[in-house]
Amino acid sequence: MTMIKLDQIYGYIWINGDLIPYQFARIHVLTHSLHYSGSVFEGERAYNGKVFKLKEHTERLIQSAESLGLKVPYSVDEIIKAHELLIIQNNIKDAYIRPLIWCGDESLNITNPDLSTNFLIASISSMPRSCEQSVHLHVSRWRKAMPNSTPVQSKSAAQYNMAITSKKEAKALGYDDALLLDYEGFIAECTTTNIFFVKDKTLYTPIADRFLNGITRKTIIEIAKSLCLEVKEERLKLAQIEHFTGCFVTGTAIEVQNISSIDLGNKKILFEDNKIADLLKREYWRIVRG
């Protein structure tokens, strides 16, 4: 598949209150956040011209910024209106939406009161559904940091360094993605998604206090309970997963995606029962399109 360069996309990006054509959207090479990972962002999806859970995404974006000491110059309502303006201007139906908040180029000191806070919202036409393909996981050698060492509920660029490294290593070994463990060796998440396991009519998922509690994750839990499925949030060990019959991951970009296998190194665990995952997937699609 031919990749389209993002700067060749037709349309506009909303930057600090203005609509800027894609090809003219630029930042300086000495931008503070480019050097120190001091940015926060959201991953959102628009369906039929409406962003799903936009208020929740916006509130989390502001909380992420505040956790890094960034003062957001816009309210939740103003950010929502900016989304609506961009959707109209770009004639958006289905798209991936990326809001980003970052520090400017006034200084390269670690902290400086004169650093500006900048805000953009970009849209990218949705790619073909990857969620229709099952994936194979490799257990990463890298561990998630202790939750008191970084704001784990902040969706910040810095949080993705380990995820990027882990996924690169997994892909180099022939896998699709990596399963990440926390600092104690319990199952945490995948590189950009939350993970669920299935046995009978019960979902098992790690407690979301050591990694980002995804908005799609919370939505799937709500859907499962509405369908009279039991949901257990627990500390899960790798040794437990061979007792589960199904496995899937959730995230805004991939929605709900089946997991075919997890390679533990000494054995490969296969998951062949997708009935519950497919049920949740159908219900999720119905809701986001509603």
UniProtKB/Swiss-Prot annotation:
CDD domains: BCAT_beta_family (cd01557). Its EC number is 2.6.1.42. The keyword Isomerase does not apply. One of its GO terms (biological process) is L-leucine biosynthetic process. The modification N6-(pyridoxal phosphate)lysine is found at K155. It holds the Pfam family Aminotran_4. Transmembrane segments: none annotated. It is an enzyme of class 2 (transferase). GO terms for cellular component: cytosol. One of its GO terms (molecular function) is L-leucine-2-oxoglutarate transaminase activity. It catalyses: L-leucine + 2-oxoglutarate = 4-methyl-2-oxopentanoate + L-glutamate; L-isoleucine + 2-oxoglutarate = (S)-3-methyl-2-oxopentanoate + L-glutamate; L-valine + 2-oxoglutarate = 3-methyl-2-oxobutanoate + L-glutamate. Keywords: Amino-acid biosynthesis, Aminotransferase, Branched-chain amino acid biosynthesis, Pyridoxal phosphate, Transferase. Belongs to the class-IV pyridoxal-phosphate-dependent aminotransferase family. Acts on leucine, isoleucine and valine. This is Probable branched-chain-amino-acid aminotransferase. It comes from Rickettsia prowazekii (strain Madrid E). The gene is ilvE.
